[in-house]
């Protein structure tokens, strides 16, 4: 690690070196990859299967974003930024989404999609792809074992039945091709996180993990820091911290909150992330912000970028309907 720091090697190149001879489970997608990576790693660890894990966020179960294990299996978050995920060699891929993001790097939505198709082509022989149902380039994905998932669409290979919200938790059955797992309870909020969990469950099924162990692991899953994380939860007030920084992620967050707290006033405190993303996704952000009952807009967080003339939070406010 010191050698890498001194000579400036990027993280994904480092991951390429240390995973090239392992059985690799690589989680990609413009949305949800951190959560799904943590879910897969948790299912493997809790069930006793074992894995090495490189997460993009801090696991609420284990208070770390990395752990090691003697089993030569690696669960890794495959980051599309700068096409760095193309350096990995997956045995199992999960592709949660391929929506336009990082357009400062890719230029066009088509180039983002092209990168994900190229990522699918990195799959090792005999490998498996688990992809969100309805991806724009789904017809171009090729694998010996290919599954799609969508919790609310029975046309998907993996879907959900008997979904209920009971005391703030989701109770459901997952139906797959030739298998079914009832009595699942997910305590993490957000309907999108049901999708994320059934993707992780599909990976666990590919590894022949017992259903009972999957049920127990799902019930014990506590989430990832800043992904639908309850900072406060009382009878009077609920405060949720979430890293949602794309219109689709923000919409999923708000929908998830409504599914659990349908009769509560929803106040959204939102800080846009990156000037380029705010500019490229301005219309989507404004439309999504209108879904909240009350909105508090903070100045844009620039991260690695310099300010852009005319790109600011007021621009989003001016495009809102404010109904």
Report residues per predicted region.
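N-terminal leader/targeting and accessory segments in enzymes
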Residues: 1-12, 161-162, 189
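C-terminal helical cap/extension that packs against the catalytic core
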Residues: 285-323
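Active-site regions of enzymes building and remodeling cell-envelope glycoconjugates
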Residues: 5-6, 91-94, 143-152, 157-161, ...
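P-loop/Walker A phosphate-binding loop and immediately adjacent motor/lid segment at beta-alpha junctions
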Residues: 7, 111, 122-127, 252-261, ...
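Nucleotide phosphate-binding/pyrophosphate-handling subdomain across enzymes
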Residues: 166-168, 176-294
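Short internal beta-strands
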Residues: 129-133, 267-270, 292-302
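Phosphate-binding loop of NTP-binding sites
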Residues: 10-133, 137-146, 198, 204-207, ...
């Amino acid at each position: 690690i010191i050698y890498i720091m001194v000579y400036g090697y990027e993280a994904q190149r480092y991951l390429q070196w240390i995973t090239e001879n392992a059985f690799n489970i690589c989680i990609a997608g413009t949305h949800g990859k951190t959560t799904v990576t943590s879910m897969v790693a948790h299912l493997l660890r809790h069930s006793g299967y074992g894995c090495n894990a490189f997460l993009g966020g801090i696991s609420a179960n284990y208070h770390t974003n990395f752990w090691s294990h003697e089993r030569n299996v690696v669960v890794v978050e495959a980051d599309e930024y700068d096409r760095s995920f193309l350096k990995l060699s997956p045995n199992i891929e999960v592709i949660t989404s391929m929506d336009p993001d990082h357009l400062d790097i890719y230029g066009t939505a088509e180039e983002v999609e092209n990168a994900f198709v190229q990522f699918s082509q990195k799959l090792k022989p005999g490998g498996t792809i688990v992809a969100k149902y309805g991806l724009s380039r789904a017809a171009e994905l090729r694998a010996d074992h290919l599954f799609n998932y969508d919790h609310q669409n029975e046309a998907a290979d993996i879907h959900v039945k008997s979904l209920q919200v009971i005391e703030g938790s989701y109770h459901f059955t997952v139906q797959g091709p030739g298998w079914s797992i009832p009595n699942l309870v997910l305590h993490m909020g957000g309907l999108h996180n049901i999708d994320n969990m059934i993707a992780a469950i599909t990976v666990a099924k590919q590894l022949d993990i017992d259903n009972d162990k999957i049920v127990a692991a799902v019930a014990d899953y506590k989430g990832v820091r800043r992904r639908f994380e309850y900072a406060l939860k009382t009878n009077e007030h609920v405060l949720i911290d979430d890293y949602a920084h794309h219109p689709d992620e923000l919409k999923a967050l708000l929908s998830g909150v409504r599914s659990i707290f349908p009769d509560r006033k929803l106040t959204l405190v939102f800080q846009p992330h990156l000037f380029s993303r705010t500019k490229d996704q301005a219309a989507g952000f404004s439309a999504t912000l209108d879904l909240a009952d009350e909105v508090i807009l903070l100045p844009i967080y620039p991260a690695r970028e310099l300010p852009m003339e005319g790109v600011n939070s007021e621009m989003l406010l001016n495009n809102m309907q404010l109904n």
